[in-house]
């Protein structure tokens, strides 16, 4: 794998640190008036998703991580594993609950997902940025009830709960941003 120096760190770069893969989220190269230059880097640990801030000297280097992002189609969940398929080779891949994590509530059958592999094993699953889900349960919105925040909780077909505007009713299909878990719009 390639070696990267701290001044080569860019957002999206995946590096190895302490024997684990990390993704660079932000990097700021600082040249102080006195002293050695350094890079202030924000990293995300790919195995757990935790964020770390670290300072590297300009002479520090890191090995590139052998991490592959693949576009796979979500098939089904058998209770223990989530199954995905490569649309070109029709090869199937199974990811455990740990790899899917909180994103399980956004997985729909036949949805295109990005599965991150490290040493051939899935370590994270990223659903599409937007999904369209049906509301299966929400309180009825009362006309003129705008004293509150203007929102109410709604349970979706996958079990996720999001805050929606008062005019949205049970049975409607809504568009949700999976990155923030927020309501975007109604689907016509």
Swiss-Prot record:
Pathway: Protein biosynthesis; polypeptide chain elongation
Modified residues (N6-(3,6-diaminohexanoyl)-5-hydroxylysine): 34
Protein name per Swiss-Prot or TrEMBL: Elongation factor P
GO molecular function terms attached to this record: translation elongation factor activity
Any single GO BP term: peptide biosynthetic process
Presence of keyword Protein biosynthesis: yes
CDD domains documented for this protein: S1_EF-P_repeat_1, S1_EF-P_repeat_2
Posttranslational mods: May be beta-lysylated on the epsilon-amino group of Lys-34 by the combined action of EpmA and EpmB, and then hydroxylated on the C5 position of the same residue by EpmC (if this protein is present). Lysylation is critical for the stimulatory effect of EF-P on peptide-bond formation. The lysylation moiety may extend toward the peptidyltransferase center and stabilize the terminal 3-CCA end of the tRNA. Hydroxylation of the C5 position on Lys-34 may allow additional potential stabilizing hydrogen-bond interactions with the P-tRNA.
A GO term from the CC aspect: cytosol
Keywords: Cytoplasm, Elongation factor, Hydroxylation, Protein biosynthesis
Family membership: Belongs to the elongation factor P family.
Protein purpose: Involved in peptide bond synthesis. Alleviates ribosome stalling that occurs when 3 or more consecutive Pro residues or the sequence PPG is present in a protein, possibly by augmenting the peptidyl transferase activity of the ribosome. Modification of Lys-34 is required for alleviation.
Protein's cellular compartments: Cytoplasm
């Amino acid at each position: 794998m390639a070696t990267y120096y701290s001044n080569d760190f860019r957002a999206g770069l995946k590096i190895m640190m302490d024997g684990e893969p990390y993704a660079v989220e932000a990097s700021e190269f600082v040249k102080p008036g006195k002293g050695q230059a350094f890079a202030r880097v924000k990293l995300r640990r790919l195995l757990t998703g935790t964020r770390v801030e670290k300072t590297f000297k300009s002479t520090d280097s890191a090995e590139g991580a052998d991490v592959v992002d693949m576009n796979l189609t979500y098939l089904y969940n058998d209770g223990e594993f989530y199954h995905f398929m490569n649309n070109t080779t029709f090869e199937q891949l199974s990811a455990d609950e740990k790899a899917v994590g909180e994103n399980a509530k956004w997985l729909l059958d036949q949805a295109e997902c990005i599965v991150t592999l490290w040493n051939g094993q899935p370590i994270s699953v990223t659903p599409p940025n937007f999904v369209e889900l049906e509301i299966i349960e929400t309180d009825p919105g009362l006309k003129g009830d705008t004293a509150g925040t203007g929102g109410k909780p709604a349970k979706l077909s996958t079990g996720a709960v999001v805050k929606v505007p008062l005019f949205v009713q049970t049975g409607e299909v809504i568009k949700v941003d999976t990155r923030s878990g927020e309501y975007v719009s109604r689907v016509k």
